[in-house]
UniProtKB/Swiss-Prot annotation:
Protein name: Photosystem II extrinsic protein U
UniProt family annotation: Belongs to the PsbU family.
Location, primary (coarse class): membrane
Keyword Metal-binding carried by entry: no
Subunit comment: PSII is composed of 1 copy each of membrane proteins PsbA, PsbB, PsbC, PsbD, PsbE, PsbF, PsbH, PsbI, PsbJ, PsbK, PsbL, PsbM, PsbT, PsbX, PsbY, PsbZ, Psb30/Ycf12, peripheral proteins PsbO, CyanoQ (PsbQ), PsbU, PsbV and a large number of cofactors. It forms dimeric complexes.
Organism: Synechococcus sp. (strain JA-2-3B'a(2-13))
Length: 122
């Protein structure tokens, strides 16, 4: 009976050691934000194309698409009011606030479909 308990303890220990590392990085990554990158030329959130958000870690493609589709904005607070943003996405926008400018929206100059897909293939 003692040997059976010893084997059972070893099996449980091996399973814990095998599966424990799988869960820890996932939890740690979910709580962390990508590093903030300072841009020399800020992004004009009202007139930029989707691909410009590739410069900012964590934005491209999902958050970038949300921001492009919901433009124009008057301020950072307007960006944070987008329906459906997660707390992590809001934190990412706030952390990168210095990389955004709110230029006057040029309606007709950049149609939404062209701001999302400029046809760069290859």
């Amino acid at each position: 009976m003692r040997w059976l308990l010893s084997i059972l303890v070893r099996v449980v220990l091996v399973l814990c050691l095998c599966f424990a590392p799988l869960g820890i990085p996932v939890v740690a990554r979910a709580a962390e934000l990508p590093p903030v990158k300072h841009l020399d030329t800020p992004i004009d959130v009202n007139n930029t194309i989707l691909r410009n958000y590739r410069q900012l870690p964590g934005f491209y493609p999902t958050l970038a698409r949300i921001l492009v589709k919901n433009a124009p904005y008057k301020s950072l607070e307007d960006m944070l009011q987008i329906s459906g943003l997660t707390e992590q996405q809001k934190a990412l926008i706030k952390a990168n606030a210095e990389n955004f400018v709110f230029g006057e929206y040029q309606e007709g100059a950049n149609q939404l479909e062209n701001r999302i897909n400029q046809g760069y293939y290859g």
